[in-house]
Amino acid sequence: MTGASGCVGQYISRWVLDHSDAELLLWLRDPAKLTAVPTDHPRIRLMVGDLRDTDRFAQELASVNRVIHTATAWGDPERAEQVNVVAVKRMLALLDPSKLEQIIYFSTASVLDRHLRPLPEALAYGTEYIQAKARCLRELAQHPLASKVVAVFPTLVFGGRVDGTSPFPTSYLTEGLAEVSRWLWLARWLRVDASFHFIHAEDIARICGLLATRPHEPNREPGQGALRRVVMGQAAISVNDTVKTLCRWRGVARTPGIPLWPWLIETLIRVL
């Protein structure tokens, strides 16, 4: 498991630890951030180091039969390329194909169209993170181990608690709810025609845990090649329903609303 100290990584680690007898090799940079599973558990071994120092763990990588790769990087273009593309290729090269049964590779739903095909715009116009993920997916689809790969594509991820009291780390989306709540006094007056998908990290953990503890199944979808694709998300929820739910959560009265016209957006940007 890479990215083992992250929000999704810890939810998955906890699920696998509780629902299987698997031995977990947790690859992470800072053991102090591992809060949801005990570091001294007899079925847990820590691999402390950066994903870019892949060769340090060549022996461990050659011994595993399942890989769950959640680690990622964004912000700095060079680091994003090194972590999201170069390090992944090196990690795959150090795995033993005769022992390896499955790789669960975390990407993002932003690189696919509605037919689960790679989105050309992701490579052309995406952020450094999106572009790196799109390049890695393209290379994985052509890799000799492609038939053993399950590429998972989470939508927006909730996890942990807004107040930070959960043993699991708070996801960036959940963390942002505190800031969003400060603007409900304004948002409750507005209406917008838009929707989005989301998923909770606990649901991601259950899906990945079931994939990782059952016999690997090859991709059966026609026209997609050997690499299997799984998009993770709830049914779409509208922005208006989201604001309504947040208002109820925070005890803010819902009001009649007006459409968020372009000129109104520009006015709000200038005023606020």
Regions found by a protein language model. Give the residues of each.
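NAD(P)H-binding glycine-rich loop region in Rossmannoid oxidoreductase-like domains
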Residues: D40-R90, L112-R117
